[in-house]
Amino acid sequence: MHPTFSRILLAAALASAGSPAVATEIQLEQGWNAEQRASWYDASLGSRLLPLAWAQALERPDSEEHLFSEDNARRLGFPLRNWQGGELRLPRGFALDQQDDSQFSDTRLRWKARQSSSEPWVGLNCAGCHSTDISYRGSELTVDAGATLANVQAIFDEVLAALRRTSDDGDKFARFAGNVLGSEDSPANRDLLKAALAKRAALIDTLLSMSATDLQPGPGRLDATGQSLNRAAINSGARHLQANPTDAPTSFPALWHTLQMDKLQSSGFVPNVKVLDLNGQVFDLGYLAGDIGVVQGDYGDVVSHPLSGLEGYISSIRVDNLTRVEGLIHKLKAPAWPSQLFGAPDSARLAQGKRLYEENCAACHASIGRDDLQTPIKVRQVRLKAHGDDAPIGTDPWMACNTFTFSSPSGNYFGLFRPSLGTPSGVGIVGRTSKIADMQVPEVFQIMLGKKGQLADGIAEIIHAIVTGQQTLPGSDSLQALPTGQLLLAGGDPAGSQAPSLAAGEVPADKSARKDYCLNTEHPFLGYIARPLNGIWATAPYLHNG
């Protein structure tokens, strides 16, 4: 889990904010100390977008300005910061990833003779999409794990355009090669470098072409779910991929209280299942599964193979660091309104807002104290179709509809066991063509098995049982502690327990017909969840449908 700003200009500031030469930086209290904040911004999760040497040398497509210059990084919404407090400056939300790539696929690139198999790469981490800046009257506030207003899609598009232009423009390539190769610059190494450039551009182009749409998400929004699903389809190794336009951008959620919620993602399609490890500690299995999907969409390297057993898939995804980051989120608090800077809220307006909230919002959005980081939160989901006493939600259906219907040939995922957890079609076997969400879940479990050494004691055995169909997850909504190694929280109603099994071939290809299909189908994934609204003052834009 980036054109323009990562700055929220509060409405009150528009008339009065100046342009100070030096801004006063203010860090809000959110439950983290300095070391924990540094871990949030510096940890590699296994995303590998570009080799570091390339990122430092790559120019913007239409100029000689470096792609990650101070000005361009800030324009895109990723101000540069000193990674791990050292001299290396990376866009905020980018981290250095250095692993042995000998068994990787997409990122096992060689651009010079006798090159190391542990070249450093850069890629996104959680802070890339979940950190916020607020500018107000000469002060700069940082909101940790908030909702970015960076233009995430633009940075991917610019990277691809820069790779292509560098490969095609002789002068650009000469400058690039000189910077990347240094003392090892030679005709032979330039040939290797050009081939590596072409390979990297082709991989990024495959994902962006598969996801192509005329809709531009712009700052603060991204169809991250669609991108993650399409990346899972690419990682299947299937030869003939099906285009699935990522035309359902949503704003980025703030992450406080999310580990307490029973459903995750805008449509609630990821049940926040928790299990107990052999030491009796709660392990956030559902949250980890969702995060692995996000890192995969952000150019994590995954190597799938047919009919995988229990050895799992090799990948660059850092399950160990994901688990540590989730530990940080357990401690994260929503930012309190900074009265010392903005002034105390008007008491009359507070009373008016409280009344409006109780009349129009409280029925869906649960209330929880800012300091309450333990109480489980059962989120309210409102369906696209009328359901029981609920009227249809009446908002943009496409994030939920696309997640439910995106399909593709299954490639190496064919024959994997499909658990009820997080799959639209419930328990079964992945077929030759499948809904991507039906095959991404078993794929993510295979990624976990490939990192079993980074899992807590006993968790690999639970995943073994799930992927072989020996343990299925109940449909109960109850929150209860069960014996060690068993399910702790079902996280809502798994699709397989109550929903019809729907084959990919039943989904209409025509978009208008697909919309009608989603609006008239009863399914737990076809709706949106309403979460607690703590800290919402810091999470613009305020779109009710995300």
Predicted feature descriptions by range:
Residues 375-472, 482:
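C-terminal engagement modules used by replication, chromatin/transcription, nuclear envelope/ESCRT
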